[in-house]
């Protein structure tokens, strides 16, 4: 056991470890969000006894757990490590031991994050950790320092993983697999790795300066010493905006594969899809100040960031319409992954539309720091990144495990989370338009109605996640029975347009699903092909 799981250098085992920590963190983050929603279900103080600091500690815990310990480990560490070598015909990742270190840095990071909530009054700064609220005057204990260490460790982990993904993709493709034949999920992880590589050092620099300000009397963000807290915001958001694309681009890759498989046809405009992802990634670095319209930027600066932000809608639209064109005229099977993919298309588009509204500097003056923003980013994260994670699990887990989930239960779980998430986050837009501020545990009575609706929706979504845990249990215990009883709607193992590993160099058809041509579950080393350079 110790040899296999503690010292593991096998990408598949490390991916399983990533999934385990993602599931654990996701449950913890969901629990925190439920406490937040219970507190906000009615005006006045409900459960936190007026402890507003604790409310903000829950907010920062929920955010950091969901972003750094659920979505990134699941989509990048889990699906990335497991599927990327299979899809390019590599026997493992390029640096297997680096992979192991990358995972085991996540665990102390999680410990640091949990500890930060337990010392003094916790880090009640919001996930952005803005000074002067995060300065030593406003947060005097070591809580913020521990949160900074957690960010440092996850950053190093992600950087090591990114280097690994880039080198693997460039150097370990099988014979005949040119970059143009790379499956879309591999492209997604590849582009994501570059985004991480370029954005994380900036975050690390920013929080390191904050650490020095707090403990070693420097004045990077201290006005009295000639510093400027706005510098921190620029550094943070130069990471923070690419980060949201880091969270969603692997989801784009998963959705492409699912839509293609269940429509029985290749993705419409595959090269365009790759260029769209690359454009989104590049433009993501040029728009960071749209998070800061109200800090006193010049009018021409605001005009630039408004225009640049709206340009990102173009490659995103290319992706949405290409997915729709893939579905159009296909032989559609509405199995669970396809339901999630179609829901993703609708809900991600809604999130994108509210994003276009927020891109306008003049409108954002009204919307900034209201629940409109919360509604917007939960549509793209909760119903974009998380939906694509669950979709990817339902799509690949029968192949990964050789065990099948109960299709009927999975469909019920889909409809529950679909209804629950919408009922939770749609009212937030209405609250935001009416001016309800974020990160405040109490509110005027006028906001009571929609807040109650949102809290009911969060309860529905939580029930669906409990059902998801039961579906996992059922899959591990009764997986073979489910397969035998046809309780699972099986996809065809290899759609007509998929070509096998041996004939890459003989044809020009771009394959997208070698992983389904392997044994189920795959062997410890699925391929023994030598690494070749194109």
Curated annotation (Swiss-Prot):
Keyword Oxidoreductase found: no
Residues where O2 binds: 245
Pathway named in the protein's UniProt entry: Energy metabolism; oxidative phosphorylation
GO molecular function: cytochrome-c oxidase activity; heme binding; metal ion binding
Cofactor binding notes: Binds 2 heme A groups non-covalently per subunit.
UniProt keyword list: Calcium, Copper, Electron transport, Heme, Iron, Magnesium, Membrane, Metal-binding, Mitochondrion, Mitochondrion inner membrane, Respiratory chain, Translocase, Transmembrane, Transmembrane helix, Transport
GO cellular component: mitochondrial inner membrane; respiratory chain complex IV
Residues binding Ca(2+), per UniProt: 39, 42, 44, 441
EC number(s) reported in the record: 7.1.1.9
Cellular compartment(s): Mitochondrion inner membrane
Gene3D superfamilies noted in UniProt: Cytochrome c oxidase-like, subunit I domain
InterPro entries (alphabetical): Cyt_c_oxase-like_su1_dom (IPR023616), Cyt_c_oxase-like_su1_sf (IPR036927), Cyt_C_Oxase_1 (IPR000883), Cyt_c_Oxase_su1_BS (IPR023615), Cyt_c_oxase_su1_dom (IPR033944)
EC top class, as a word: translocase
PROSITE patterns (UniProt xref): COX1, COX1_CUB
Cofactor field: heme; Cu cation
Membrane topology category: Multi-pass membrane protein
Catalytic reaction annotation: 4 Fe(II)-[cytochrome c] + O2 + 8 H(+)(in) = 4 Fe(III)-[cytochrome c] + 2 H2O + 4 H(+)(out)
Binding of heme a3, residues: 376
Function in brief: Component of the cytochrome c oxidase, the last enzyme in the mitochondrial electron transport chain which drives oxidative phosphorylation. The respiratory chain contains 3 multisubunit complexes succinate dehydrogenase (complex II, CII), ubiquinol-cytochrome c oxidoreductase (cytochrome b-c1 complex, complex III, CIII) and cytochrome c oxidase (complex IV, CIV), that cooperate to transfer electrons derived from NADH and succinate to molecular oxygen, creating an electrochemical gradient over the inner membrane that drives transmembrane transport and the ATP synthase.
Protein name, entry field: Cytochrome c oxidase subunit 1
Organism of provenance: Candida glabrata (strain ATCC 2001 / BCRC 20586 / JCM 3761 / NBRC 0622 / NRRL Y-65 / CBS 138)
